[in-house]
């Protein structure tokens, strides 16, 4: 697609679909969790997800936008122009999603990536432990294979965003 045409299409779509309340520029980390739970933020996320723009460069087969680097840059520029906050954020998009895309099985990609893109799956990270803090070399939690599943024993603490998450990726 011609980048100028894509820019115009993107600009028009953002003007029509990004709520004014989501055009606030940057959001402080501590405020982001609550903001992204509001009805308007969920509406913004759902509209963007339907277009694949919660994960613009991820493959379309999993709900991503399939954008190349130039289109992705244009989208980012147009969002910045209107001070739109990202339609979705979190550990799913930032950490575990890219890991699953790169290293996961086809089954794992099909199971998890569309739910990350849509916002149905909210992830948190389980790293810190009592007595170890975030010293990853001191982790005590263990995962033991039992048949076809892992049994995890241990404790995790200080899990940012856990109150909003329905999935956790944990270091063991």
Feature-to-residue mapping (PLM):
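A structural signal for short hydrophobic beta-strand segments in well-ordered beta-sheet cores
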Residues: 141-144
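Short secondary-structure junction/hinge motifs that connect adjacent elements
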Residues: 21-47
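Intrinsic disorder at enzyme termini
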Residues: 1-5
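A short core secondary-structure module
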Residues: 148-149, 153-172
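Hydrophobic, small-residue-rich alpha-helical packing segments that form membrane-like cores
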Residues: 132-135, 150
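A short, Trp-centered hydrophobic/proline-enriched beta-strand micro-motif
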Residues: 119-127
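Internal helix-loop-helix
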Residues: 42-119, 160-167
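Conserved short loop/turn motifs at secondary-structure junctions
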Residues: 27-36, 60-64, 96-102, 128-131
């Amino acid at each position: 697609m011609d980048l100028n045409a894509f820019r115009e299409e993107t600009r028009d779509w953002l003007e029509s679909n990004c709520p004014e309340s989501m055009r606030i520029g940057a959001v402080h980390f501590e405020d982001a969790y609550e903001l992204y739970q509001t009805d308007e933020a969920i509406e913004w996320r759902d509209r963007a997800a339907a277009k694949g723009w919660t994960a613009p460069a991820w493959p379309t087969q999993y709900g991503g936008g399939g954008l190349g680097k130039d289109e992705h840059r244009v989208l980012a520029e147009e969002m910045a122009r209107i001070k739109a906050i990202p339609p979705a954020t979190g550990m799913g998009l930032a950490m575990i999603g890219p890991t699953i895309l790169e290293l996961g099985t086809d089954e794992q990609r099909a199971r998890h990536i569309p739910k990350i893109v849509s916002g149905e799956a909210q992830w948190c990270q389980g790293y810190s432990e009592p007595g170890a803090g975030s010293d990853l070399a001191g982790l005590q939690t263990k995962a033991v294979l039992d048949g076809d599943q892992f049994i995890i024993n241990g404790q995790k603490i200080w899990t940012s965003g856990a109150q909003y998450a329905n999935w956790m990726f944990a270091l063991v």
